[in-house]
Amino acid sequence: MNEIPRIIDQLEREHAGEPWHGSPLMQILSGISHAQAAAKPIANGHSIWELVLHITAWKNETRHRLSGGRAGDPQEGDWPAVGETTAPAWREAVERLELAHRLLVSAVRDLPEPKLFEPTNDLRSDGIAPTYSELLHGIVQHDVYHAGQIAILKRASSAT
């Protein structure tokens, strides 16, 4: 198997497939009400809704970087504001997450394999840019990390 299909496999597993670590993100999100999504059971912590918007923003930023865009915070911000907390707004947030995921997978599928080992347009730190492969593995790790946070918040909101 080439690297592109492996990366797509990892993206799909963490999003809605069968990841090694447990439940995928979309399964964790299923059954969460808009009230649960907006709740902040941990003082100074993020809500499920904020985490969903953050994951979406970084999927979009990753896709921007794949197209050669300069690295930076996502266009919508690192932690986009939630806005209104209605049931339709929550459904829309989850749908935007799904769309961002599909667009990212499509962009990865269209990526020429040799580009994976080229540096991204990211010279913010020590002058050594990560490769596109490192960027893509990083977004999988990012999403798994935040999916775990969402799972804990979901459990906490179900216990009250």
Where are these regions (language model features)?
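Acidic/histidine-rich alpha-helical segments that form the ligand environment
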Residues: 82-119, 134-139
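Short, contiguous alpha-helical
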Residues: 2-22, 26-29, 34-81, 121-160
